[in-house]
Amino acid sequence: MLRKQAGEEDSVVLIDMTSPEAGNGCSYGSTAQASEAGKQQVAPSRVGSSANPPIDFVLVWEEDLRSRENPTQDKTDTHEIWRETFLENLRVAGLKIDQRDVQDEAAAVHYILLSAPWAVLCYYAEDLRLKLPLQELPNQASNWSATLLEWLGIPNILLENVPDTPPEYYSCQFKASKLQWFLGSDNQDTFFTSTKRHQILFEILAKTPYGHQKKGLFGIDQLLAEGVFSAAFPLHDGPFSVVPESSQVLGLTQRQVLFKHWARWGKWRKYQPLDHVRRYFGEKVALYFAWLGFYTGWLLPAAVVGTVVFLAGCFLVFSDVPTQELCHSSDTFDMCPLCSDCSFWLLSSACTLAQAGRLFDHGGTVFFSLFMALWAVLLLEYWKRKNATLAYRWDCSDYEDIEERPRPQFAATAPMTALNPITGEDEPYFPEKNRVRRMLAGSVVLLMMVAVVIMCLVSIILYRAVMAIIVSKSNNAFLSAWASRIASLTGSVVNLVFILILSKVYVILAQVLTRWEMHRTQTAFEDAFTLKVFIFQFVNFYASPVYIAFFKGRFVGYPGNYHTLFGVRNEECPAGGCLSELAQELLVIMVGKQIINNVQEVLVPKLKGCWQKLCSRRKKAGMGANPAPWEADYELLPCEGLFHEYLEMVLQFGFVTIFVAACPLAPLFALLNNWVEIRLDARKFVCEYRRPVAERAQDIGIWFHILAGLTHLAVISNAFLLAFSSDFLPRVYYSWTRAPDLRGFLNFTLARAPPTFTSAHNRTCRYRAFRDDDGHYSPTYWTLLAIRLAFVIVFEHVVFSTGRFLDLLVPDIPESVEIKVKREYYLAKQALADNEALLGATGVKGEQPPSSEPSLGLPA
């Protein structure tokens, strides 16, 4: 049933305490609610209280004391009113607030230290359906490579003995009326872990209004965007710097353990302590690092095979008959001009280019393309198994279906409510047809941005053509000979600049569109945002390589009848073919982007951190030498999330798979980059970022489906690359029909200029094409076209069939995990039946135990 949400009044009620908890004579909450008139009603007594609750969250705002003398009244007063209203509503919600100020003559920094009493934690833990432990289990984490090396008796240099390994738990959704069931409930100070406390505080901050909710005046995110507060963050677990080696290892904090055993560069070859990462940063961050480590490990065999294929190409260069014929052809092949103002040239002058092309274009690339297609399929299949194991171990397998709550921004602005068929609760609702309309409108904007990318690509194509003409007219013999390659290389650099600029613009635009679409959950919001940005980035990054791979040199025409684009003659492939140019483009974009990103990730945080510390020290000049924890954490950088990290890796995955036939070294460069990336990201989270709020997740979200789509696209792309952009099939055809040793193959691939062109220039010349003397396609062209199309069909059918077979052969969930899940369901049903029988025998009617894990067998 749909219900319109009341819009006449805007209550600041965060916790409804009007009805006592079933089965528990008194309320466990200790909160208050207030109407707009300011009336307060304090909730009844607590379950218990903690004398000195820890600092759970910090709010910061800066004040320019000099502006008081000449204030810009309107904005300052509005911010002050919003801030005071927000803080008052936090007090009404039951939070403890302590303010600390640091100031000098010019400026002041105000720190609001927030703590949640036991009652508030209990209420929101139940409201948010947080899962809390019922029973401790030994940690059963295992690694297949560690198991294999142990079985073989080989020392494992990858193993790292990390102290304080987090145990596993049976857990279920928290209910305060069943508090005694939960592990550690007798100690209120440690019952809620720091990550759980942060989640609860962030939920309160995200929902608390500071004005009329329907006008969007609610939540800490909006206040940060408006500049009312300059930061909001939970505190780190002390400094990351490690105590001297002589100290006891057990004395290390969680942050110090992560720094010592994970974030240091010297640990690049060690297994990641994922359970420790999950305990400190939450499941979402841990799953990212699990995926990154898994993907990097799988890149190792791909890099080895790719390097072998490339080295094979290096040896084949000097024994390849067509390449040797080209280099020793002297003045045998007089080639037609490459542009309207260019001169005739000798094919032998392109010897170096032909040899470079042979490095990437040989029979080994066919094998490598098949290998990488199956590699990608197996990578995703085994990641599904790894993900299922981690989700079960971290107790988040059903997070999206059952646990996840509506986004605070959605809940505050949704026009009506509806019954959730899974949980049976009334939740905010936005009509799906309205969302679809908004998504269609957003897709129009996406198409416009894609059109901008295509316009940039066309401009790059024209730039290459014009640059080639200009450089070819140079008096320098070297520049003139390499005109095409110079134009291509500089065009790749210009294209990279366009890519980076357009990326920044569209990410901001996609955020606005996704917020407008009103997605119910944070997962749905992130998936929609991710899909928008990825589609744009896919076109942005891959448009130029796709043009070189599949379009360049295809629509050139022939001497005397060349095709043009805006009056400029279409580009031709160089003497070595377009495959070598594609490899160059991939290396410039992929490696260039990786270098730029890594430099940014190293230098930008350092520079920002230095600036932040410099500003902070100026504002607290004369204060104590040892800053308070909240002051030290405020000097760190705000956490920017995982979106850009995932995007970088997924785009890299596309370069590694979609165009791998042109660049077998791509997996090697990706592997080297990722070894750096893992520790770089780890250092950012441990040392340079403020602590993020721990978020739960059950998988890597829509990124997995994007990776699966790229895998399918890679099969088709490599099939067409090998068929139409490589000389592999023409060489095979020639060796079968004419000469097995490929002698004469070079002459076979060159057509003669038509008589009209020859008579106009008083000179005959050759050009790369399968055409007759009149410029028409020869029978050989049509025969090769049929062979190419047949190869594409056979290649993709073989790969897709093999991939489907492997998909069926490898279960998505490991058998051990499947047995554990079934066992838990059985125990849960058994516990429910026993509980009902017990209640029926005693005649007691009460609330049933929370259903989740095998520990539901605990008595009621």
From Swiss-Prot:
Entry's Gene Ontology BP terms: calcium activated galactosylceramide scrambling; calcium activated phosphatidylcholine scrambling; calcium activated phosphatidylserine scrambling; calcium activated phospholipid scrambling; chloride transmembrane transport; establishment of localization in cell
GO-annotated molecular function: chloride channel activity; intracellularly calcium-gated chloride channel activity; phospholipid scramblase activity; protein dimerization activity
Miscellaneous comment: The term 'anoctamin' was coined because these channels are anion selective and have eight (OCT) transmembrane segments. There is some dissatisfaction in the field with the Ano nomenclature because it is not certain that all the members of this family are anion channels or have the 8-transmembrane topology.
TM region positions: 298-318, 363-383, 442-462, 493-513, 531-551, 653-673, 702-722, 780-800
Catalytic activity field: a 1,2-diacyl-sn-glycero-3-phospho-L-serine(in) = a 1,2-diacyl-sn-glycero-3-phospho-L-serine(out); a beta-D-galactosyl-(1<->1')-N-acylsphing-4-enine(out) = a beta-D-galactosyl-(1<->1')-N-acylsphing-4-enine(in); a 1,2-diacyl-sn-glycero-3-phosphocholine(in) = a 1,2-diacyl-sn-glycero-3-phosphocholine(out)
Coiled coil (residue ranges): none
InterPro entries associated with the record: Anoct_dimer, Anoctamin, Anoctamin_TM
Keywords (A to Z) from UniProt: Cell membrane, Endoplasmic reticulum, Glycoprotein, Lipid transport, Membrane, Transmembrane, Transmembrane helix, Transport
Membrane topology: Multi-pass membrane protein
Organism lineage string: Eukaryota, Metazoa, Chordata, Craniata, Vertebrata
Source domain of life: Eukaryota
Region listing for Disordered, in residue ranges: 24-50
Recorded GO CC terms: endoplasmic reticulum; plasma membrane
Keyword field contains Transmembrane: yes
Full protein name: Anoctamin-7
Residue intervals on the Cytoplasmic side: 1-297, 384-441, 514-530, 674-701, 801-860
Entry's family note: Belongs to the anoctamin family.
Membrane side Extracellular: residue ranges: 319-362, 463-492, 552-652, 723-779
Pfam families: Anoct_dimer, Anoctamin
